[in-house]
Structures are given as C-alpha cells and as structure tokens.
Regions:
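Short amphipathic alpha-helical heptad-repeat segments
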Residues: 1-11
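A short beta-strand micro-motif
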Residues: 11-12, 55
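Charged, low-complexity interaction regions
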Residues: 16-24
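Generic structural signal for individual residues within well-ordered alpha-helical segments
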Residues: 25-28, 136
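Low-complexity, Pro/Thr/Ser/Gly/Ala-rich linker/spacer regions in secreted
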Residues: 32-51
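C-terminal, surface-exposed recognition/capping segments
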Residues: 49-51, 55-227
C-alpha cells in the first residue's frame, strides 16, 4: 500500500499542480492505467478544496483554511510569484527571479485581475486572492499568536468577533531557487500592486505582523484565498 501512495504522490509531482482540474484528471487516469483500478481517496485528499472559514469580519470576507496546494491547514503548499498562477514546490528546478521577466505577472501594471489571480485560476469561483485591505481587516479584527498545528510552526489568527480561527504556517519564501525563513516567518501575497517592482503582502515575523508590507514581485510567497 505504501508503494501505491508513493507512486500517486510521484504522479502528482511530475504532472502538474495538484489543484488544477486537468492535472487532477490526468493523475487519476494515470493511476488507473498503472493499477487497473480507480484511484483511492488518498489522491482526492491531496487535491482537496479549502474550507471557507467565517471569522465574522465586517466585510463578510471568508478565509480559506489552508494555502493553495496544501492538503491540510498546517501544510506549506505551493509558492507563487506575484501575478502568476503557476505554483511551485520548494526544491523544484525553478528560478523565481531569473524566470519572472518572462511570466504574465511581470507585465501587469495594476492590481492582479482574475486572469492572473492564483486563487481564482487554481480553485475557481468564488475564490480570489486577498487585497491588502482584506489583510488589514484580518489583522485588525483578530488576535494572533505564534503556535504549532500538528507539529508545524505558524501563526493562528482568532476572530475577536466570533472566536473562529485560521492557521497560517511559517512557509518562508523562495528567492531565486533558495528557500529562506521556513519555520520562522510567513509571507502571503495580496492582489494589490505596490509599484512596478513590488507587490503588497501579509508578512509576519518575530518582530510582529505587517498586513500591508511590500516585497519584490519575483519572490515565491504563499497564497491564502478568500471569498
């Protein structure tokens, strides 16, 4: 059984983003071809849709319970450069900095639209990337603390309004091909443009939580969807 699981994981890694419908279907068909049977629910778990968490926020915004590409709330998931919908896992042969100028996101001169929205493209309606204003609303209406979930370090945001919470792992970020600050910091893209070179993001470090920070658009950050 363990060999079966490893093969399914290998297929997912090799043939695309786990959250893309075409990749999911290909993986299931590939598994059926190899084993002569339908894939078991372990594959479905890997590609499970996020759950919308209602924190009672004034705007009515609901937050996903996990990062894009994560099968569980505590997992890192995929990393995205700003304005691009193709995510990458840490350790893959992809250079976020060198390749950025040739991506669709590099050509954006305003906020991210739906065509370039990693949440909308990978998860479908009604999911979108959060704006910097939605990050501000999250921070203003929640308490937050550094904590662990099933052994993963991160920060839990708990609503001051209804007590519901979401956990954001310390996924770190990718600069070029190097993963940095994994397990100590979190960086989450918004859809809001900072400048020609920067995008706004939620950043949290040992020094505090910053809902409207901005960083180089070519960095590989996490994406947490909203609806």
């Amino acid at each position: 059984m363990n060999n079966n699981i490893e093969l399914k994981m290998h297929i997912l890694e090799k043939y695309g983003i786990a959250t893309e419908p075409k990749s999911i279907e290909f993986c299931r068909e590939a598994y059926k071809f190899v084993y002569g049977e339908q894939s078991s629910e372990e594959v479905i778990d890997i590609t499970a849709d996020p759950v919308a968490v209602d924190l009672g926020l004034p705007s009515g915004t609901k937050w996903a319970d996990r990062n894009i590409g994560a099968s569980k709330p505590e997992e890192t998931g995929l990393y995205f450069s700003w304005g691009n919908t193709e995510g990458h896992k840490a350790g893959m042969d992809y250079d976020f900095e060198d390749d950025y100028d040739n991506t669709p996101g590099a050509k954006l001169t305003g906020d991210i639209d739906l065509e370039h929205d990693a949440a909308h493209v990978n998860l479908g309606e009604p999911w979108k990337m959060p704006t910097k204003e939605q990050f501000k609303e999250l921070v203003e209406n929640c308490t937050s603390e550094r904590t662990t979930l099933n052994g993963y370090l991160g920060r839990r945001f708990t609503s001051k309004i209804n007590g519901e919470s979401i956990f954001l792992p310390f996924a770190g970020y990718i600069d070029g091909t190097s993963l940095s600050n994994h397990g100590s910091d979190g960086y989450y893209w918004s859809s809001s443009l900072g400048s020609s070179a920067y995008g706004y993001n939620l950043g949290f470090y040992s020094s505090g939580v910053y809902p409207a920070y901005y960083d180089n658009r070519f960095y590989g950050f996490s994406v947490r969807a909203v609806q």
